[in-house]
Amino acid sequence: MNEVIVREKQYVFENIDVRYLIDKDENVSMIIVPRELSEQIQKQWNMPIPKFDARDRNMHRWDIGNIAYAHIFGEPIEQPGKTMKANTGFTFFEQEYFESGKGEGVVTYLKHIDGYVIKHTLTYIKGGFTVETEFVNNSDSDVKIDMLSSFALDNLSPFQSDDAPNKYKFHRFLGGWSMEGRRLSQSVEELNLDRTWAGFMCGNEKFGTRGSFPCNKYFPIAVFEDTDIGVCWAAQLECNSTWQMELTRFANTFSFSGGLGDREFCGWVKNIPKGKSFCAPKAYVSCVRGKVNDACNALLNMQPNADELSIVFNEYCTTWGKPTQDKMISYCQRLKELGIKYAVIDAGWCKAGCEQDGNGEWNIDKTIFPNVKEMTKQMREMGIIPGIWFEFEVTTDGSVMFEPRYDYMKLKDNGKVIKTRGIRSYWDFRREDVRDYLYEKVIRFLKENGFGYIKVDYNGNTGLWADGAESGAEGLRRHLECVREFFIKMKQEIPDLVVENCASGGNRLEASMMNITDLSSFSDAHEAVEIPYIAANLHNLMRPSKELVWAVIHSDDDKDRIVYSLCAAFLGRVCLSGDIDKLENWQYDILKRGFDFYQKLSDIIKFGKTTVCGNRGKSMRHPTGVQIVIRKTESEMLVVYHGFDDSDGEFEIDISDGYIFSDSFYADNAEIADGKIIIKDMKPYTSGALLLERK
């Protein structure tokens, strides 16, 4: 028997126990567990390693793992083409506990024989942690790295004493235009991640999204679940460029890590001059005793909440790219009766009849907006804050700025200007002249014309690489970092400005962009029946208080359709659009009733926790069954239900823990009896909502 010697350093943060494991070679890893389950930890590191026996299926094998993974360019890769994670050559140096205005936590320093240092900072915030990983070059020469993790949760699950067959699941969330947020749940066996007979050469699952649409394939959030114990570990990245996550089996346990896409994923290489450092994107991690939604909720609770839940009107689904000044004033005359706070001019204001073509100069077309200052003045006098749409990161065919004479200011790949579909090119935000130009065209324009809201759209993906750095992936990362800095500058220059984050709907619903903006467009599913399905999906991925959900109302909509649309929007922030100037009085009455109900939901949307139940089918485009969204705080419960095709059946929700009726919105087929909410007689594409309060 070979004895593994590991020492532990333990820290307790409210309900979470953090332990750092350090072996005799000074390799260090970290486990986090719910404090209430600390005594159930199975210390595989204290179990003897038996003599190798190829026929022993239960032969104990354990690997300590790491708290951070890094790879020096040119050094050997243990499993090339598969994973760049391995023993890093970084060993434990020192550790310190800290308390600051940002929270409390632990800083761990790892050292490398060549003079490099990794600084790993774990900060406790509201039931979870942020992780910041910094590579410091204290050597006497420059160094190139081609992989650096943001976080690493190793030794999963610490509650199992062996390789735990049939006890683990891995949960990911899929992106896709107008199909955002589908949960993909697979056992580790379905991922072909069983432990091998030898305990080494085990598998991994590396995934992520490449390019400038960070939620195009997957969302940068995932959950590892021990279904036997009922514990979930979740992680989320702040990254608006190419990112990756990886679930790797090392012997009996798993390593769950993530960060920037590495060289094998996207060709990333970063040069760090001597005396300088580089920080990986910030990560959020949590560990809960509960379900996937509990773990995701713990991640979201660490991030900024909305200040308000005011309703937004956006005229896009009213004019479909043909806004005018007269139309906006006419709409606002009706909107003020509904108490709408923001009214947004969407695409089409630069050139009449051109929704997205010819953008780049950002000059108002005075044939359709003859006096924009007077318009915004009138809107404010009606109590409505004016907003306007930009896609300022690009130029499009038909604009002077799209022409070749401005190519020197554009992003290039292999010397050629990056264009999508041949009609959209991209400013290089690393250039000062680009930032200065857009300061005048965007920030000064907003200031001088009285706008208090900007919808920032982004309708193209640059692809993986941009010239001008040590690797194409690093060029793109730095460009998108500068884009984010421009968003921050808008808020610095106009402190009261409300900024909406949009990228063909939900392609930028990641934490680094959502946390510096006020709200985000949930999807481009403007009028689709799957709106409530998508909106509910996203409760695991973003704060509902920042989730702007379309409610498009047309003059030929019947009561059921209006209620269906409004109830879907109650799952986040209401974004009203449609024939607002053509509705009949009875239709306005439904809107007024709905908005009165919505005003009562502020606290529960901001601070609640969501569970989705019912029997909805797997297709979003052709939904079936019934979706019931339950959102709870300690004092309130919101129930929003939607019927799709084949929506027969009766559904019961237990409220025996003390909730009573407070208000409802067209919940005519729901009743409260014997400590239950009973929903029955659902018809296709109908909906209702109930608000309850604790006795």
Q: What residue ranges belong to the model's regions?
A:
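Polysaccharide-binding surfaces and accessory modules of carbohydrate-active proteins
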Residues: 2-249, 266, 666-669
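Short Pro-Gly-centered flexible turn/kink motifs
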Residues: 92, 270-289, 685-693
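Active-site neighborhood of glycoside hydrolase catalytic domains
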Residues: 369-371, 408-561, 571-573, 582
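C-terminal beta-strand-rich structural cap/linker in extracellular carbohydrate-active enzymes
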Residues: 672-695
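Short, well-ordered beta-strand segments enriched in hydrophobic/aromatic residues
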Residues: 129-137, 499, 636-643
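Glycine-rich, aromatic-flanked loop segments that form ligand/cofactor-binding clefts
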Residues: 58-94, 218-243, 285-304, 341-347, ...
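Carbohydrate-binding surface patches
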Residues: 219-222, 618-657, 686-689
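Aromatic-lined carbohydrate-binding/catalytic grooves of carbohydrate-active enzymes
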Residues: 309-443, 449, 453, 464
